[in-house]
Design a protein with these regions (language model features):
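Condensing-enzyme catalytic core mediating Claisen C-C bond formation in acyl metabolism
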Residues: 1-31, 155-162, 167-168, 245-312, ...
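Active-site pocket-lining segment
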Residues: 180-183, 226-227, 297, 304-373
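Active-site pocket-shaping loop/turn-to-helix segments
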Residues: 17-40, 44, 62-64, 87-101, ...
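Conserved beta-ketoacyl condensing-enzyme motif
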Residues: 27-115, 119-145, 220-235, 307, ...
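Conserved catalytic cysteine-centered active-site region
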Residues: 29, 60-115, 125, 156-161, ...
Length: 420
C-alpha cells in the first residue's frame, strides 16, 4: 500500500536548466537566478496561475551567505503572490528528493494542494572562507577605538592568514572524501577499473542518445544570458559523444594514485544547474485539468555508518521504499540510480543482487544515462531524476518506477512512482 493514508499526490510536470560543468558557461550565474529560471519556466509550461501554489520548497547543499534561503527567493517571482511561504533544505545529494517528498507530505495530509519543489547548485560559486586567524584579526580590528589602534591590529596580518579555506567534500566523521570512499567501495566490493569505465561509457552513450532524440532536451529550459557575449545554453555540456574505453583508460586515478581505479572519467563532474517539479493532490490536478505524469506511491530514507561504505545506503532505503509501496523489485519497469561514481552504482547493484537476491536488468536502469554524463548539481539532481523518470514512464506506459540516490553522511533516498 502507498506511504501513509492521506491523499494521493501527483507529479504534474518538471523541468530543469541545462546541467553545465562548473567553471564553464554558467559560471557567472547565481544559484538564485538558476532556481528562479527553472521555476518560472515550469509555471509557463503548465500555464498555472501562481495563486494556486501553497508552498515552495527548495534544496541546496552549498548556499551563498548572501542568499541563505533560496526557496524564498523563488517564491518571490513576479508570477507568484508574495504571501506564499517557502523554505530551503539540505539532505546533501538527495536534497531535491527531500524537497519533493516534503511537498508530498504536506499535500498528503491536506496542508497544501499545490507545491512547487526543486533544487539548485552553483558549484562555480561556492563560498570561500577566510582563515580563522584572519577572521580573528578582523573582529579585533572592528572593535578598535581609534584608527591608530585599528591599523595596529591589522598590522598583525601575515601572508599565511590570506590563504582561503575552501569547502571540503569530506566527511567530518571520517575525514574521507566522496572519492576516497568510492575507492574504498570499489576495493571492498571487487569493482574493477574496466567495469567502472564501461558503466561511465554507457552513461555517456545513453545520455547522448537521449539528447539526440529529444527526450532529455524536452525537460531542459534554455538559459538566455544577461551578460553580453555569453552564449545561449540549450543542452548539458558534460556529455561526451566521442569518448571511448580507450580514452578513459588513459586517465590516472584521482584519489589513490598508486592503486586506485576511480578517475575523472568514471565520476560525476562538479556541475551548475537547477530543477523544478510541480506537485498537486490528485483531486486538485483533475480540477485544474492536468494529466499527471505519475504519482508518488511511496518513499524512504535510510542511513549507514559513514565509516563502512559511505555510498551504500541505497541497499537500505530501496527495500524500505518498496515495502511501503507494497511492490517487489521485479515489478519495477524503470529505475533511475544517481551516479555519483561508477564504483558506487556498481556497488549498489551488487548489494541489490547479492545481498538482497534481486535480479538486475540493466536495460531498465538509467535508460538515458546518468549523473556521470549529465552532471550533478548537488541540490538539483533529485528534481532531474523525478522529471526524467516520470516522463519516461509515460512514454513507455510503465506502471512502477524507482529513484535511488546516495548522499553524503552515509544516507540515501528512494522514491517509488506509479502511473495509474
Amino acid at each position: 500500500m502507498p506511504t501513509g493514508n492521506g491523499r494521493r499526490v501527483a507529479v504534474v510536470a518538471g523541468c530543469r536548466t541545462p546541467f553545465c560543468r562548473a567553471g564553464s558557461v554558467l559560471k557567472h550565474v547565481r544559484a538564485m537566478d538558476l532556481a528562479r529560471h527553472a521555476a518560472r519556466e515550469l509555471l509557463e509550461r503548465t500555464n498555472l496561475d501562481g495563486d494556486e501554489i501553497d508552498e515552495v520548497v527548495w534544496g541546496q547543499v552549498v548556499p551563498s551567505p548572501l542568499v541563505p534561503n533560496v526557496g524564498r527567493e523563488v517564491s518571490l517571482l513576479p508570477q507568484l503572490p508574495k504571501e506564499i511561504p517557502a523554505y530551503s533544505l539540505n539532505r546533501a545529494c538527495a536534497s531535491a528528493n527531500q524537497a519533493v517528498t516534503n511537498a508530498h507530505d504536506q499535500i498528503s495530509i491536506g496542508h497544501a494542494d499545490v507545491v512547487l519543489a526543486g533544487g539548485v547548485e552553483t558549484l562555480s560559486d561556492v563560498p570561500i572562507l577566510v582563515s580563522r586567524g584572519l577572521a580573528d584579526i578582523l573582529v579585533d580590528a572592528s572593535k578598535a577605538k581609534s584608527l591608530t589602534a585599528r591599523l595596529g591590529v591589522l598590522s598583525r596580518i601575515r601572508p599565511r592568514h590570506l590563504v582561503p579555506v575552501t569547502p571540503a567534500i569530506a566527511e567530518p566523521s571520517t575525514g574521507m572524501s566522496m572519492g576516497q570512499s568510492a575507492e574504498k567501495m570499489a576495493k571492498e566490493n571487487g569493482i574493477s577499473r574496466e567495469a567502472q569505465d564501461r558503466w561511465a561509457l554507457r552513461s555517456h552513450q545513453r545520455a547522448a542518445q537521449g539528447t539526440s532524440d529529444g527526450r532529455l532536451t524536452a525537460e531542459i529550459v534554455p538559459w538566455f544570458p544577461s551578460r553580453e557575449g555569453d552564449p545561449i545554453v540549450t543542452a548539458d555540456n558534460g556529455i561526451r559523444t566521442d569518448t571511448s574505453l580507450e580514452q578513459m583508460a588513459k586517465l590516472k586515478p584521482v584519489f589513490d594514485r598508486r592503486y586506485g581505479s576511480v578517475t575523472a572519467a568514471n565520476s560525476s563532474p562538479l556541475t551548475d544547474g537547477a530543477s523544478a517539479v510541480l506537485l498537486m493532490s490528485e483531486e486538485k490536478a483533475r480540477a485544474l485539468g492536468y494529466e499527471p505524469l505519475a504519482y508518488i506511491r511511496a518513499y524512504a530514507v535510510a542511513a549507514v555508518d559513514p565509516g563502512w561504505q559511505l555510498l551504500q545506503a541505497p541497499v537500505k532505503a530501496v527495500p524500505l521504499a518498496l515495502q511501503r509501496a507494497g511492490i517487489q523489485w521485479k515489478e519495477l519497469g524503470l529505475i533511475e540510480i544517481h551516479e555519483a561514481f561508477a564504483a558506487q552504482v556498481l556497488s549498489n547493484l551488487k548489494g541489490f543482487e547479492e545481498g538482497l537476491g534481486w535480479e538486475i536488468d540493466e536495460e531498465i536502469i538509467n535508460v538515458m544515462g546518468g549523473s556521470i554524463a549529465i552532471g550533478h548539481p548537488f541540490g538539483a539532481t533529485g528534481g532531474r531524476l523525478v522529471t526524467t523518470l516520470a516522463n519516461e514512464m509515460r512514454r513507455r506506459d510503465v506502471q512502477f518506477g524507482l529513484i535511488s540516490v546516495c548522499a553524503q553522511g552515509g544516507m540515501a533516498s528512494a522514491v517509488v512512482l506509479e502511473r495509474r
